């Protein structure tokens, strides 16, 4: 996939697992590895936004046909979509889309994506903290 300049589905499945685990250090390492393969941050974050969209599509049988991937990958999407709430996915799509919109005008694009990744990995963590406090 490196030659085609197309990021593999596995990168996004891995990134999403790390986000759901609130694992910011490993997520930043994965992003750095992706950059070192020659991909840019914009490509990474827009792909991640699409991945979140596809996970949301998997959560309802009526929208499953909107997923344009093979059977094996569809199964992976369905499995991962069970781990992510609709609220999480909406927030994640919103954050990734916001990063996409700001990317071209950002003076520090890498930091913008890294900050977005940290925010993404904190979505469910914040919820846990709120539960502990109340």
Regions found by a protein language model. Give the residues of each.
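Extended, largely alpha-helical regulatory/partner-binding modules appended to the mid-to-C-terminal parts
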Residues: 1-133
């Amino acid at each position: 996939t490196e030659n085609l300049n197309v990021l593999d589905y596995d990168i996004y499945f891995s990134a999403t697992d790390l986000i759901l685990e609130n694992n910011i250090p490993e997520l930043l390492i994965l992003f750095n590895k992706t950059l070192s393969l020659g991909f840019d941050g914009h490509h990474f974050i827009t792909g991640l936004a699409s991945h979140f969209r596809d996970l949301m599509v998997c959560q309802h049988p009526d929208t499953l046909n909107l997923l344009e991937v093979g059977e094996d990958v569809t199964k992976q999407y369905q499995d991962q979509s069970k781990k992510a709430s609709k609220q999480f996915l909406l927030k994640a799509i919103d954050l990734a889309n916001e990063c996409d919109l700001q990317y071209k005008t950002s003076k520090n694009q890498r930091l913008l994506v890294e900050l977005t990744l940290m925010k993404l990995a904190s979505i469910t963590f914040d919820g846990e903290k709120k539960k502990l406090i109340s």
